[in-house]
Every structure is written in C-alpha cells, then in structure tokens.
Amino acid sequence: MILTRSLATLGLIGTLVFAPAAIAALKVGAKAPDFSAPAYLAGEPFTFKLADALKKGPVVVYFFPAAHTSGCNVEAHLFSEAIDKFKAQHATVIGVTAGKTDELADFSKETEHCGGKFAVAADAGARIAKKYDALLKLKPGWSDRTSYVIDSSGKIVHVYSALSPNQHVKETLDAVSALATK
C-alpha cells in the first residue's frame, strides 16, 4: 500500500515537472514569430534571419537547453546525421539556445555535434524562446527542448516538445516530408 502510494506520488510529481514543457509550446496553425539572431555555421559567425530562410522553403527551428550538455550533444549529432534528408526537402534546420551561447562557435563545427552541417543561433536573454513559448521551466534563462516545423508561408505546421532528444529529428523530418507531398 505504501509502495503503491509512493509510486503514484512520484508519477504525479514527474507529470507536474515534465508536462508543462509539452503544453507550453505555440500551437499548430499559429504564425511563427519572426526573428533574427547571431548564429554560427562551421564556426563562422553570421546573422540568421527566419524571414530569409523561409524564402528557400520550410524551416525547422529546434530549441535546445545548452551547447555541450549530454542531451543537446545527442540531438545536434542526430540532426547532423539527417541533414541531407532535410536539404533534399529544401528545408533549413536551425538550432536555437539561450544556454552557453559563448560555446556555439565551437559547438557548430565539432564533428561529434553539429559537424558544420547546420547553423546554431545564440538567443541572448531567451528573447526568441519567450516568443516561441519554449523556456525551460526548471531553468527559465534557458531554452526548452521544443522543435517547430514552419512552412514557407510562416505558419507552424508541427510542434514536438520532449526533454529526451531522441525523437526530435524523426518528428521534424516526418513533418517536412509531409509538406513535400502536399
């Protein structure tokens, strides 16, 4: 009885801690907030502009907590492995983080992370994450792990929010592929 009650309490606590991230994201059908931000591709600085990227096709904006952290390393590596599949669909991938932004130049070029295959943007003060309702509840100055697929008209067509990095690439690639068949 005590064990059952303890497990139920732990389950409730887990739901309260982790569920808000999935609920907080902007909804499918909403207009994606426009942004520009300092970014890095293969260690080279540039300014990423969502409006410019959308002129080329759909954009995957994936928010991640911080460079050089275990889950974020995995997620970046998975995106780098799949980047050719995104490019085949004329999609741009941009990672956005408010955490450890001073490490993004290295993170963007390291082969075990982004491998120079896609850009990552610095979100100083989490201003972009706030617009996208993608703040990490447990550490409000950092981005949550939430991925958006935005069609070329600027409309959000897919949202996936989960602290585990493992399904973000599959979820976003499936959504981008579905756009191509429309």
PLM regions with names:
Residues M1-S6:
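Positively charged n-region of N-terminal signal peptides that target proteins for export
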Residues P20-K182:
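Chalcogenol-based redox active-site neighborhoods
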Residues A8-A19:
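Bacterial N-terminal signal peptides
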